[in-house]
Amino acid sequence: MAKQSMKAREVVRVKLANKYRAKREELKAIISGVNSSDEDRWDAVLKLQSLPRDSSPSRQRNRCNQTGRPHGFLRKFGLSRIKVRETAMRGEIPGLKKASW
């Protein structure tokens, strides 16, 4: 189990990323825009740098919904590999069965 503070930190990062998503996209469009002047680009870069670090989506970490484990995360299920195996063995994931060949 991950510490509660680590799970809470991820929740804050998700909220910040959602809050600043539109502003971030707008500034990045100005920076990468062909028609933008150098001065506008530089202003956009400075504004982008002044946004909170945790508002960047790349700072988010996928975590298991049940345990908060950051490694071995399977996106399809939203769980770590360990919890996927446990729930699959109990038959709680519809359509998933153990492979045998």
Swiss-Prot record:
Q: Which GO terms describe its cellular component?
A: cytoplasm; small ribosomal subunit
Q: Which residues cross the membrane?
A: none
Question: What keywords does the record list, in alphabetical order?
Answer: Ribonucleoprotein, Ribosomal protein, RNA-binding, rRNA-binding
List the PROSITE patterns.
Answer: RIBOSOMAL_S14
Using the UniProt annotation, give all residue ranges assigned to the region (Disordered): 49-70
Taxonomically, which superkingdom? Bacteria
Give the record's family classification: Belongs to the universal ribosomal protein uS14 family.
Q: What is this protein called?
A: Small ribosomal subunit protein uS14
Q: Name the species this protein comes from.
A: Yersinia pestis
